[in-house]
Each structure stands twice: as C-alpha cells, then as structure tokens.
Amino acid sequence: MENIEQRVKKIVAEQLGVNESEIKNESSFVDDLGADSLDTVELVMALEEEFECEIPDEEAEKITTVQQAIDYVNAHLKK
C-alpha cells in the first residue's frame, strides 16, 4: 500500500499532467506546477475521492502546496 505522500503526489501528477518526479513537497500547485483555478478545484475533488474525506471550500483555499495537501489528508483521514 502506498503511503499518503505517494498517493497525493500520484493524484497531483495525474490531475496536472506533470511527471511525478517533478513534484516536490514544497511545490506550489499554481506557481510551480502550472495549475489554474479549475485545476485546483479538480485536484481537491480527486483528493476527496481518493481519501474519502470532504474538504470544505475555506480549507481547500488554504491548500496551495503538495505538503499542505499531505498534511490536510493526514490530519483528516478517517481512521
């Protein structure tokens, strides 16, 4: 089973069409990985689906880097 970090990076790569090797934890979805606002919405939806959690809009707006996505999932994952 892949860990959360690997799963988040895989989703980011698939959603944004970037190579997984280019994705660093500190990568910004918009500044480093070229995401636009629609990409970020779709990315949040993909994370919600993968991890079976709901990310409220006000929380989703705060998730701007790969590490923030990993941290959010770790904190809110259904145990």
Curated annotation (Swiss-Prot):
PROSITE patterns: CARRIER, PHOSPHOPANTETHEINE. Keywords: Cytoplasm, Fatty acid biosynthesis, Fatty acid metabolism, Lipid biosynthesis, Lipid metabolism, Phosphopantetheine, Phosphoprotein. SUPFAM superfamilies: ACP-like. It is found in: Cytoplasm. The keyword Lipid metabolism applies. 4'-phosphopantetheine is transferred from CoA to a specific serine of apo-ACP by AcpS. This modification is essential for activity because fatty acids are bound in thioester linkage to the sulfhydryl of the prosthetic group. Residues 2-77 form the Carrier domain. It holds the Pfam family PP-binding. GO terms for biological process: lipid A biosynthetic process. Pathway: Lipid metabolism; fatty acid biosynthesis. InterPro entries: ACP, ACP-like_sf, PP-bd_ACP, Ppantetheine_attach_site. The modification O-(pantetheine 4'-phosphoryl)serine is found at S37. GO terms for cellular component: cytosol; membrane. One of its GO terms (molecular function) is acyl binding. Belongs to the acyl carrier protein (ACP) family. Carrier of the growing fatty acid chain in fatty acid biosynthesis. This is Acyl carrier protein. It comes from Azoarcus sp. (strain BH72).
